Structures are given as C-alpha cells and as structure tokens.
C-alpha cells in the first residue's frame, strides 16, 4: 500500500498574507492625536524675585466658568467677540511703555491705532491677558478662547509688518524660517514681536 505524504504548508505564502494584513491594519487604523496649544513655559523666578506692581487697567481678564460661559472684563461675551475686544485692549496705547533695560524711560506707542483711553492698557508691552478657567471647563472651549486671543496678536502683527515692511508678518516669519542666516529678516521679525509681545497668562483654575 502506497504511503500518503502529508502536504507541506507554504511558509512563504503565509508570510505574504501576514504582511498584507499588517498593511491593511496600518491603512485602516486611525490614531488619536491630542490637540493643544504650543507654549513656551516661563522660567522659574529666583527666590528673591519681587513681582512688579501691575496696574489693573493693564490686565485684560477672561474668565470661563464650568458651564463654558465667558466673562470678559466683567461682561458676558461670545467666543467670536474675544478677538476684537483683545485687539482693542492691546492696541489702546493710552500711556508709556516699559522702561528700557538701560534705565531709559518708556515711550508712547507711536504705531498703536487704539482709542488711547486712560482707563485701558498703556502700551502693548504692558498689556497682559489673564485667562482663568474652572476645573470643570471643557478643554475644547479653553482652546477656542486661546485661539481667538492668538488671532488678535496675529492680526496686529500682520498690520504693523505690512506698514513697516510691506509684507504680512506670517509671510515674513516664514521667509526667516527658510533663511535663518538672514540677519535683516531676523531683525524685522524681532522688531514686530517686540512691538506686539504675546503676553497671555493662565491663572490658577477655580474650583
């Protein structure tokens, strides 16, 4: 009686199938990516650091409660209204800027186009935006508020860059990123950033 041989399994074909399954998994699987805002954290101050006295008019308060309602400078406000309110505050130019590092007195903002109200911010380099949320505030709402505030700075920087250098700041910054050795571009980017420094402070969340 003839012996019946057991058929062999084609290992090569199984490897091909496993590879195809892996490719299928990679193509059809989605990965959750956390959204957020890129921020440079402030350095820890020295033990003997004394915080400067800040006038109340130089602080723009944004409060987000647990129901995701916004209270901006004491008034109820919608998210889409924040940008214009922030621009009005930052660009007010109602007084003098910070003194220079060499002790020279601060100067008025000659490029500001605001109302120059004595009850609002003195200068863009003194204008602080304080954002305080509740521990139950939705993160999505917090991000939308931050985005509107960043858009306010972006609009002011673009405007000034167009006036001084005939190019929007976003394009100026991109040009510098492509040519880091260009000192002229570097000075222009720094000039606009110093003129409208992005000062957003996150206050401790309320309970």
Please annotate each region the language model reported.
Residues 32-207:
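Long, low-hydrophobicity, acidic/polar, solvent-exposed interaction domains
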Residues 1-41:
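Short terminal targeting/anchoring segments
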